[in-house]
């Protein structure tokens, strides 16, 4: 539903852009069966707020048959933006969910999302009830990795999100909310509201684990989540290269400031196993070990690089659903079992 609403809002043109890309749409959510839209309009356009509101209501009525719409308009002041960003740090448990685990990395390209997806599916294979929250607004990958492209989040009769399901897990991803390839320009308050709706107004049911796949680094997605949800811990994904350690250090220190426990470090693409069974460190070595010793955080496992691991991910098939065919793949399965033990 939200995906279609934003599509309509993008058609509301202002000069050569639209109200979404201009950052005027602050919040969009349902409350008591009424659609509420909060707009932040710059001073030079504030006198046209009634006209803009009427255009929005007409468009939503004609294209989506929405009748109950309330539009709240405020002038966009710099001081308002500063106040809005001061969200109260009071994380809560999500009803029915026993453990909430975040998967994070210092930079992109380390296989974080692939590990998060396979961990979730591996837990489900062990008969745990599992949910998966793809928190990467700018580059959601669950659509591809979990083969749910084109599936949108549906809304229940009591205005709750219904997760998409595949591979035995319940999935909420921005790939099921936003159009593919459309840039997202959100400020902290928008993140906070949308994340709050998705975390607390989704029909998760009773879960043993909710796995959250964070975007790389430390930004609004991580901050909003830690302000809203009481996490049981974070797993940090890195690679053996020492050149990437500074990014990981920043990520670890950021989560410590947010008072979130670091469960351990997973070193991905650590080595390859050749046809003779010999280990070859093609991307360097000891990156995860250095971090483990520096921060006194467990190095949970080292995951070898395997071509089929990557190929299956590109085709929407989690690696753990297949039987291992060689020593490298056996070690990968063992690594995910090791992570399951840690959480």
Kindly label every feature range from the protein language model.
Residues 178-225:
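Phosphate-binding/switch loop-helix module in NTP-utilizing enzymes
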Residues 315-325:
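C-terminal boundary of histidine-terminating zinc-finger modules
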Residues 11, 49, 53-56, 208-209, ...:
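Conserved catalytic-core segment of NTP-binding enzymes
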Residues 1-28:
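N-proximal, solvent-exposed amphipathic alpha-helical segments enriched in charged/polar residues
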Residues 123-186, 192-195, 199:
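Phosphate-binding loop that captures ATP/GTP phosphates
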Residues 9, 25, 97, 108, ...:
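Residue-level signature of catalytic and energy-coupling elements of molecular machines
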Residues 21-24, 31, 41-45, 49-104:
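Extreme N-terminal, non-catalytic leader segments
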Residues 99-138, 252:
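Walker A/P-loop phosphate-binding motif and the immediately C-terminal alpha-helix
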């Amino acid at each position: 539903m939200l995906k279609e609403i934003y599509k309509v809002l993008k058609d509301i043109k202002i000069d050569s852009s639209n109200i979404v890309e201009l950052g005027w749409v602050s919040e969009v959510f349902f409350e008591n069966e009424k659609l509420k839209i909060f707009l932040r309009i710059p001073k030079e356009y504030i006198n046209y707020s009634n006209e803009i509101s009427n255009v929005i209501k007409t468009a939503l009525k004609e294209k989506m048959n929405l009748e109950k719409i309330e539009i709240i308009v405020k002038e966009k002041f710099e001081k308002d933006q500063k106040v809005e960003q001061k969200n109260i740090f009071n994380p809560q448990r999500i009803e029915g969910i026993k453990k909430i685990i975040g998967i994070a990395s210092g930079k992109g390209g380390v296989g974080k999302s692939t590990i998060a997806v396979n961990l979730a599916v591996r837990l489900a294979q062990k008969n745990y009830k599992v949910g998966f929250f793809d928190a990467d607004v700018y580059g959601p990958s669950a659509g591809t990795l979990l083969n749910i492209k084109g599936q949108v989040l549906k809304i229940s009769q009591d205005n709750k999100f219904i997760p998409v399901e595949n591979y035995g897990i319940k999935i909420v991803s921005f790939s099921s909310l936003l159009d593919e390839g459309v840039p997202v320009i959100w400020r902290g308050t928008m993140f906070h509201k949308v994340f709050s709706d998705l975390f607390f107004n989704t029909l998760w049911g009773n879960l043993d684990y909710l796995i959250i796949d964070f975007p790389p680094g430390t930004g609004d997605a991580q901050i909003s989540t830690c302000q809203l949800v009481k996490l049981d811990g974070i797993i940090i994904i890195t690679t053996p290269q020492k050149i990437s350690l500074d990014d990981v250090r920043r990520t670890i220190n950021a989560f410590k400031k947010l008072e979130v426990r670091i469960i351990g470090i997973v070193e991905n693409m650590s080595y390859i196993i050749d046809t003779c069974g010999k280990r070859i460190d093609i991307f360097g070595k000891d990156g995860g070990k250095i971090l483990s010793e520096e921060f006194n955080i467990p190095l949970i496992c080292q995951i070898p690089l395997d071509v089929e691991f990557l190929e299956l991910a590109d085709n929407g098939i989690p690696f753990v659903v297949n039987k291992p065919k060689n020593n490298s793949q056996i070690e990968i399965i063992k690594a995910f079992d090791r992570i399951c033990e840690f959480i």
